[in-house]
Amino acid sequence: MRSWKVGVPLFLLCSVAFASESRLPFGTVFKGRDQFNRLVAKAKAGNWKALPIGERTAAVGQALVGTRYKHFTLEIDNRIESPSVNFQGMDCWTFFEIALGFARMLNEPESNWTPERLLHYIEMDRYRGGECTGDYLSRLHYLEDWLYDNDRRGLVEDLTRDLGGRSVSHSAREMTAGWRHYRYLAANRSLLGPLARMEANVSSRPLYEIAKSQVARIEPKLRSGDIIGIISRDRGGLRSTAHVGLALRTSDGVLHFMHASSPSNYGRVVVDSELSKYLYRYGSDSGILVARPLR
């Protein structure tokens, strides 16, 4: 992303390189128990569980404002892929994902508001078909692939076309091009071939974009908690998803972009400017996609 997913039991994991089951220590897959406990206390005090899922997601996101930005928080082992959560540092993807997963957890009885249950909802969201197989490629690495999978399973609704989005030429290739930056790929180069095939599959599907010149027009139709994917354009004109955050409508009616901002900017989770104005901050940003949480 800028600057540079209800499945099997959580910790029954397979090695990327081997067929035998393996486990990662809980301290590796979950960081920030104190922050989690404070968030649970805020959820109880504010009765967040009574809110619709979108507003609930936005409330969690607001409570995470100020959390420092941290790259590659999901690259936690050389071989084993596992659902994980880090409240001590987030990138743009894990910010929206943790906010949404925590909001979903609040549907359950308070006795189930635990780190283990949050990891369950992260698995449901983050992995193809909602299941982490232990294979690095079971994770949904591209936002457009995440949207396709989560929309298909009824977890979110892709609103992009209904809001006037048009199909654009695009390419998913960031990971094979920059594989040395990814711990799992650097340690398991045999994954590059399957990864390239996965990227080709993602690139073969249509990508719909609401042009940034049209975002001000459709902003009144957006709601707090909508997931906003930022699409950028490369020098050749191909689009790719480059950043992601949440919509937040404040009491004055303004629709803000709430996101984990990279160290070259704020370096933390922030409530940024009005979405339509934010998009003009970067010349390469060409538009957005929109997903609305359903449950």
Tell what function each PLM region has.
Residues M1-V8:
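Bacterial N-terminal signal peptides that target proteins for export
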Residues F11-A19:
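Hydrophobic h-region of N-terminal signal peptides that target proteins for export
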Residues A19-R295:
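Cysteine-nucleophile amide-bond enzymes
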